Every structure is written in structure tokens, then in C-alpha cells.
Amino acid sequence: MIADEVARELREAGLRWNPKPGDAFAINRSELSGERFTVSEMTIEPHEFDTGTILGFNGTTEWALDSLAVEDALWIPREDQLRELLGGAFRHLAKTPDGYRVSIQLGGEERMFEHEDASTAYARALLSLIGASVA
């Protein structure tokens, strides 16, 4: 799973989140640093309104938070979601002695991104792809 800092970089680069069951997220509050939550039809559901998406915390009586604007949540994309977001640019994932290498096709060239964690290698590749699309 990618670190909050990497997820924040993705959001700042323009990656938008449409919450779905199974999605992991963090709450942008210092007292909840490092905590992960999962969107679930049983406990945390996205509710769509004209003003935006609200995450409703259902059946969590010990929780002092009833709902949260999606803008106050930080999506932590999973490895499969990151790979899907790379779309046709994705070439392959390879194991290296120090971790993983993700290869993408970008501007007619193969670009490689390495990290000890496969999810972070995917995220770095996606950041590069997003950066190239807005340049």
C-alpha cells in the first residue's frame, strides 16, 4: 500500500476519487495519521449530493464522526487500481533484487520506475503519466 505522502502527490497532480466499496482512504487529521479506512456498504458508504460526495459512517456508535466530505479524505489507491489507471501505457511489472520495476510507454519511449513496494512503483509511473498529460 502506498504511503500517505505518495497518495497526496497523486491527488495534487490531479487524480480524482469516486469512492467505491473496497477503496481505502485516510482522513486528513493529525490525530488519525496512519489510520486506514475502507469504503464498505456495511459501515462506510459514499452518498452523492449536488454539493459533492459525503462518506457516511454507518453503525459505528463508538465513532464520533457521522460523515466526512470526500475532499477531507485521502484516497489510498490499491496496486490493481494504480495499474488500471495506467491504462494502455502500462507494459509490465518485474521483480528486481531490491523490489519491483514498472515499465510504461510514454511519448514513444519506455520509462521504468523502481521501488521496494510494487504499489509505489505503480504510483510513481502514474505520476509521470499524469505529469506528461498536463504538460
Model segments located where?
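Extreme N-terminal leader/activation tails
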Residues: 1-31
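Short amphipathic alpha-helical segments
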Residues: 2, 74, 117-118
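Functionally constrained cores in energy, signaling, and assembly domains
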Residues: 4, 22, 79, 119-122, ...
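N-terminal segment of the canonical double-stranded RNA-binding domain
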Residues: 16, 35, 40-112
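Generic alpha-helical propensity signal that fires on short helical segments
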Residues: 19, 28, 33, 120, ...
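Ampiphathic alpha-helical segments that act as solvent-exposed interaction surfaces
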Residues: 111-135
